[in-house]
Each structure stands twice: as structure tokens, then as C-alpha cells.
Amino acid sequence: MSALILDGKSVTKKSEEDLRSRVARLKELSNGAVPILATILVGNDPSSATYVKMKSNACTRVGMDSLKVEMSEETTTEELLAEIAKLNANPNIHGILLQHPVPPQINERQCFDSIDLSKDVDGVTCWGFGRMAMNETSYGSATPKGIIRILEAYDIQLEGKHAVVVGRSPILGKPMAMMLLNKNCTVTICHSKTVGLDKIIKTADIVVGAVGKPEFIKADWIKDDAVVIDAGYHEGGIGDIELQPLMSRVKAYTPVPGGVGPMTINTLIYQTVEACELKLAQ
């Protein structure tokens, strides 16, 4: 049996074609204005700078603009809050991304929660998470929302399925579980300290690896015909799941790289365009 490859690059390419049309339409309706994503980079972390550049490039590909705000390593919580307040008040900014991580002297949660809900296109505020958990309108955290979009693009059945999410981070594991629950999955949330993890995963129709440890989830823990989503990425191009032995016996899987990663950035852009459309409709 050959497993279905859930190709995030392919889904992203199709999404970008649609987003280009939507941005062009917004430009017509707003006298040349286009959606703008503001990214805030605090400090000198090279990986963060790379991610911000990738997001800027994604904006360009669909005809959007991006505004990069760079702040020093010595930035205080108060200074960052003031910058976010300016972006909240700017009517030309439709989405705000605070690149994680920030320097240790900054209260990251306080800064995340200061982002206006209508501009929280990365789905990082507690208020947004609460609305999402209650199945109310909100912007989902970009990675789990991207995973849902991949599953829907390939018509993977979710309703009635048992999904095991391995990981409990506030921007991935927890929102992933809530989104799957909202799609009528029966959801079990596990983590690296779960007792009997292998036995629990063996019961899963859908496995989401979001634990942040390379190949932590072993291939023989996963049953035949499962759908395998690997949200991890580590040095050497491996994820959180031991994928290689699974490729011939599971129903479908996301490759690493090229699966979840492209959809995370695309979802950020997708939700920024959506925010602009909603504002224009008001």
C-alpha cells in the first residue's frame, strides 16, 4: 500500500493562487490599498529573522504588503507594548505578528494579549483561543489551523475519528486539540510525560506529533491506516514522528519538510487577507 502524501507545498501553491485573486479584488475595492501584515522582531535571533523574511516573501507572492518592525535585544515589555499599541491603532495594518521567542526580560504573554483581536492573525491571544475553543469566530493559531486546512484539502474524514494530539503547547497542541474537537473528532491530549503513551497512540485514527522532540513518536506505536500529521522539524530534516517506516502502511502522512511548515506561513497570510476583507465589509 502506498500512503497518500499530504503535500503542504501543493496546498500552499493553490491557496496562493486564490489569495492573489482576493488581494487584487481588495485593491480594486479600496482605491489601491492592499492587506498589510506587520511583523515585530525583537532581538538578534537569526532563526527568527529568517522566519520573518519568509513571511514577508509570502506576502509579496500574493500581492500584499508587509511592515517589519525591528526592536533591540534590550527592549522592555513597556516599549514593546507601546509599539503594539501603535500598530493596533493604525487602520492600514490588518494583521500583527510578534515573532516568538522574545528576549527573557519581556513578558511575552502580556504582549501577545495586547494585540487587537481583529488583528490577531497568528492566533496567539488568550481571548482568541477562548473564542476558538468555544467554536466562535476567531483566527486560529497558524500551525494547527494550517493542519486543519491540509486535512480538508485532501478530504480526510474527521468526524467520528479518534485523534491523539501529542503535545500541549499554547500555540500548537492545545489549539490543535480544540480545533479537532470542533470538527467532531474524539480527542485525546497527550505529552512527553503521559504514562502508556504508546498504547494510547495505537488506538488513534489520526496522530498529531507536536511534542518538539525528534522522532519521539515511534513508528510501531501507530496502527495501519492511520493519518499521521508531523508538526515537528529538527536538524537533519526529521520531525517528531519516526516517519520512514510508516510510509508504506499508513493511510496518509505529512512529509518533513514540506508538509505542515508551508501551511503555517500560508495560514498567517490567509488570515491577514480575511481580516482585511472583514474590515472592508464593515
From Swiss-Prot:
Q: Which reaction is recorded as catalysed by this protein?
A: (6R)-5,10-methylene-5,6,7,8-tetrahydrofolate + NADP(+) = (6R)-5,10-methenyltetrahydrofolate + NADPH; (6R)-5,10-methenyltetrahydrofolate + H2O = (6R)-10-formyltetrahydrofolate + H(+)
Give residues annotated as binding NADP(+).
Answer: G167, R168, S169, S192
InterPro entries noted in UniProt: Aminoacid_DH-like_N_sf, NAD(P)-bd_dom_sf, THF_DH/CycHdrlase, THF_DH/CycHdrlase_cat_dom, THF_DH/CycHdrlase_CS, THF_DH/CycHdrlase_NAD-bd_dom
List the pathway annotation: One-carbon metabolism; tetrahydrofolate interconversion
Q: What is its EC number?
A: 1.5.1.5, 3.5.4.9
Looking at the Swiss-Prot or TrEMBL record, what is one Pfam family this protein matches? THF_DHG_CYH_C
User: Mitochondrion: is it a keyword of this entry?
Assistant: no
Keyword list, A-Z: Amino-acid biosynthesis, Histidine biosynthesis, Hydrolase, Methionine biosynthesis, Multifunctional enzyme, NADP, One-carbon metabolism, Oxidoreductase, Purine biosynthesis
Q: Which Gene3D superfamilies match?
A: Leucine Dehydrogenase, chain A, domain 1 (3.40.50.10860), NAD(P)-binding Rossmann-like Domain (3.40.50.720)
A GO MF term? methenyltetrahydrofolate cyclohydrolase activity
GO BP field: L-histidine biosynthetic process; methionine biosynthetic process; purine nucleotide biosynthetic process; tetrahydrofolate interconversion
What domain of life does the UniProt record list for this protein's source? Bacteria
Got a GO cellular component term for this one? cytosol
> HAMAP family under this entry?
THF_DHG_CYH
Q: What does this protein do?
A: Catalyzes the oxidation of 5,10-methylenetetrahydrofolate to 5,10-methenyltetrahydrofolate and then the hydrolysis of 5,10-methenyltetrahydrofolate to 10-formyltetrahydrofolate.
Could you tell me which PANTHER family the record lists for this protein?
C-1-TETRAHYDROFOLATE SYNTHASE, CYTOPLASMIC, C-1-TETRAHYDROFOLATE SYNTHASE, CYTOPLASMIC-RELATED
Q: How does it assemble?
A: Homodimer.
Family stated for the protein in its record: Belongs to the tetrahydrofolate dehydrogenase/cyclohydrolase family.
The protein's name is: Bifunctional protein FolD 1
